[in-house]
Amino acid sequence: MQLCVALDLEKKEDNLSLLQELKGLDLWAKVGLRSFIRDGAVFLDEIRKIDGNFKIFLDLKLYDIPYTMANAALECAKLEVDMLTVHLSSAKSALTILMQRLNALKKRPLIMGVSALTSFSEEEFLMVYNAPLKTQAIKLSAMGKESGIDGVVCSVFESLAVKEALGKDFLTLTPGIRLDKSDKEDQERVANAKEAKQNLSDFIVVGRPIYHAKEPREVVLELLKDC
């Protein structure tokens, strides 16, 4: 299991300062919408300057019509990121075209499909998708696998079911990881790192428990022990 550190702080300088503290550790730097829109592609180069061994996870959750989405993914791949997210709700045709475009490259990022955001409660998910959360997450994941993507973003509570249905080689990335599960904030389906490993998660995403800590590096070292 690998650790992705979410860089969601208010200022670019704060994100870079956090990474300076974590230099030399085996982790992924997750760049989301806020940081990428504010700081641009140059931010990715600044991450690499701090530690060239940090892998970069560009979490943009692409969602559009097929060719627009494929072209956007191609531009992201040109930035030499190591992982990229797309929405599974964009449907099989969009994902298939996207993967055809990326597979033509000598090197491409891992493509992870977002099934259900961890901010969804079961009730909210039913209202939007008219299906039970776990059932729909597996259905979307199966469609993603047929399209050729590498894995899915899901909560810890769907990870094991996805693996059982689609095989252990189909990757799962699980956000909503907390040190204290009572600290949900805007997430509904949270778990800790040990539970993520028990449920065969390949990647975990941790943000606020790290950068709200007095000693972020110590928190990361503890998380890495659980990985």
Curated annotation (Swiss-Prot):
Record's CDD domains? OMP_decarboxylase_like
Q: Does the keyword Nucleus apply?
A: no
Q: How does it assemble?
A: Homodimer.
Q: Which GO terms describe its biological process?
A: 'de novo' pyrimidine nucleobase biosynthetic process; 'de novo' UMP biosynthetic process
Q: Identify the GO cellular component terms for this protein.
A: cytosol
| Residues annotated to bind substrate | 8, 30, 59-68, 118, 178, 187, 207-208
What is its pathway? Pyrimidine metabolism; UMP biosynthesis via de novo pathway; UMP from orotate: step 2/2
In terms of HAMAP family, this protein maps to: OMPdecase_type1_B
The gene that this protein is the product of is pyrF
Task: State the taxonomy lineage.
Answer: Bacteria, Pseudomonadati, Campylobacterota, Epsilonproteobacteria, Campylobacterales
Q: Please give the catalytic activity noted in the UniProt record.
A: orotidine 5'-phosphate + H(+) = UMP + CO2
Highest taxon above the source species: Bacteria
Q: Where is the active site?
A: 61
Name of the protein: Orotidine 5'-phosphate decarboxylase
Can you tell me which family this protein belongs to?
Belongs to the OMP decarboxylase family. Type 1 subfamily.
Q: Which residues form a coiled coil?
A: none
For this UniProt entry, the molecular function terms from Gene Ontology, in alphabetical order, are: orotidine-5'-phosphate decarboxylase activity
Q: What does this protein do?
A: Catalyzes the decarboxylation of orotidine 5'-monophosphate (OMP) to uridine 5'-monophosphate (UMP).
Assigned keywords, A-Z: Decarboxylase, Lyase, Pyrimidine biosynthesis
Provide the E.C. number(s) assigned to this enzyme.
4.1.1.23
Q: Which Pfam families match?
A: OMPdecase
- What PANTHER family does the entry give? OROTIDINE 5'-PHOSPHATE DECARBOXYLASE (PTHR32119:SF2)
